[in-house]
Design a protein with these regions (language model features):
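Extended beta-strand/beta-hairpin segments
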Residues: 1-70, 82-162
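Alpha-helical metal-binding/catalytic segments enriched in His/Glu/Asp
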Residues: 72-76
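Conserved phosphate/anionic-ligand binding catalytic regions in large, soluble enzymes, centered on
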Residues: 79
Length: 162
């Protein structure tokens, strides 16, 4: 750890997305900037998203809401593992299940009073570890994705008409 170079801890992650049809999209993750340099994945990660048929998709892939829950679960489990290791805490297993509630009245434009996205997310974690319950709570709260979802952050949208 070089505390004299705080910029080494600043990262920028990138993804590009192409809409294909109806609820079907293809997202590519090619690289990121961090630790003072650019990184490229040896092969871009290609992620497909779709909506279930009841939401006018074809049900060929997880939907965007599923990916939000997936990102949260993966980040929380990884954060527990990394921070436990840094503190010398043994973790044998982490299992996470999540539920997110959405009222589509907002998304469908049927109500301006209902949010368009998740109204709440419940995370249940089973962690086999020698840590105390208080330590496990602290470890789970280190997740950057959980922090992002808990805070209201600006999302800047740039639109280029073609």
């Amino acid at each position: 750890r070089d505390r004299g170079k705080p910029d080494l801890a600043k990262f920028t992650f990138r993804a590009s997305n192409k809409w294909l049809t109806c609820g079907n999209n293809q997202t590519s993750v090619k690289g990121f900037y961090g630790a003072g340099q650019e990184f490229s994945h040896p092969k871009p990660f290609e992620l497909e998203a779709d909506e279930p048929e009841v939401l006018l998709g074809e049900g060929k892939a997880p939907g965007p809401a599923d990916y939000v829950l997936t990102a949260l679960a993966a980040c929380m489990a990884t954060s527990v593992s990394y921070h436990a290791a840094a503190k010398g805490i043994n973790v044998e297993s982490v299992e996470t299940s999540l539920e997110g509630d959405i009222d589509l009245h907002g998304f469908l434009g049927l109500s301006t009073e209902v949010p368009k996205g998740f109204q709440n997310i419940t995370v249940s974690m089973k962690i086999k570890s020698d840590a105390t319950a208080e330590q496990l709570e602290e470890l789970a709260n280190m997740s950057p994705v959980a922090d992002t979802l808990k805070r209201a952050i600006p999302v800047k949208v740039n639109i280029e008409k073609q």
